[in-house]
Regions:
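Short beta-strand-to-loop acidic/aromatic patch adjacent to the donor-nucleotide binding site
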Residues: 1-7
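Conserved donor NDP-sugar-binding/catalytic core segment of glycosyltransferases
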Residues: 7, 11-44
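A recurrent flexible, glycine/aromatic-enriched loop bordering the glycosyltransferase active site
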Residues: 61-81, 97
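Short, well-ordered alpha-helical scaffold segment located
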Residues: 84-88, 122
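Acidic donor-binding loop at a coil-to-helix junction in glycosyltransferase catalytic cores
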Residues: 97-104
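Hydrophobic residues within well-ordered alpha-helices
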Residues: 108-109
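Active-site-adjacent helix/loop segment of glycosyltransferases
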Residues: 115, 121-194
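Juxtamembrane C-terminal module of membrane proteins
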Residues: 194-231
Length: 231
């Protein structure tokens, strides 16, 4: 799987993803390293390096205590899946508002398989989201987590978020650009506001949800299905 806004960084992308899957038959999914576009802003550029380091790692159930929510991280911006396992575990959930790749990765991990971050498989992919876009995106992210308490109830993503913020602040100071901490702070406000509202989406009206989401069509389909089911 690869999204239309991602570009292979070299000719070895598919080879490296396939290698990651075939090295160990217990590896159910492998995802690529994401490198920033040339026009990527400094804060987002660092976020890419934080989430997609230059060292590969295989993640399994035994890593949950150490890695927390990142154990289940997998991005189908560019990823490969073992076909037999993909079908055995039911593939991607549908309909889904967000995180379909992460949900599958969690199913694979809990089933005793591994998810491989393959740093040698590289794509160019980044966004310069506005604060409003960050708000909408994190609203949907939190909704998806709330809909899956079996995965996220015992593992908080907020701790990982704070780790990223602190690391980014330290980085900005180290490169002589502490003034960008203000930009980082504004982005964090947008992200956190969207996230907290998403966690409480069941208390919001439909009108409020449509103002917060970046996926209005998902909600319309969901609500229509509820009517059809008589709920």
């Amino acid at each position: 799987f690869m999204t239309q806004d991602a570009l292979p960084a070299d000719k070895s992308l598919i080879e490296n993803l396939v290698k990651a899957l075939t090295e160990d038959e217990k590896t159910g999914a492998a995802y690529a390293r994401q490198l920033p576009n040339e026009n990527c802003r400094i804060v987002e550029r660092y976020t890419r390096s934080f989430n997609y380091p230059d060292e590969s790692r295989k993640k399994g159930k035994a890593d949950i205590e150490e890695m927390g929510i990142k154990t289940f991280f997998c991005s189908d911006v560019c990823a490969a899946y073992r076909v037999d396992l993909f079908h055995k575990l039911g593939g991607f959930e549908s309909p889904v508002i967000f995180n379909e790749d992460m949900f599958f990765a969690a199913k694979a991990v809990f089933a005793g398989y591994y998810v491989k971050y393959e740093a040698e498989a590289k794509v160019i992919h980044s966004h310069n989201y506005t604060v409003r876009q960050q708000f909408h995106r994190n609203f949907d992210l939190a909704v998806s987590q709330t809909m899956h308490p079996e995965i996220f109830e015992q593992i908080s993503s907020e701790a990982e978020g704070m780790k990223l913020v602190k690391s980014t602040m330290k980085y900005l100071c180290s490169i002589g650009k502490p003034y960008l901490i203000f930009e980082l702070g504004i982005q964090c406000v947008g992200k956190y506001a969207g996230y907290r509202l998403g966690k409480r989406y069941k208390k919001l009206s439909r009108k409020q949800i449509l103002k917060c989401t970046m996926s209005p069509e998902y909600w319309k389909r969901l609500w229509n299905q509820e009517v059809s089911d008589g709920n």
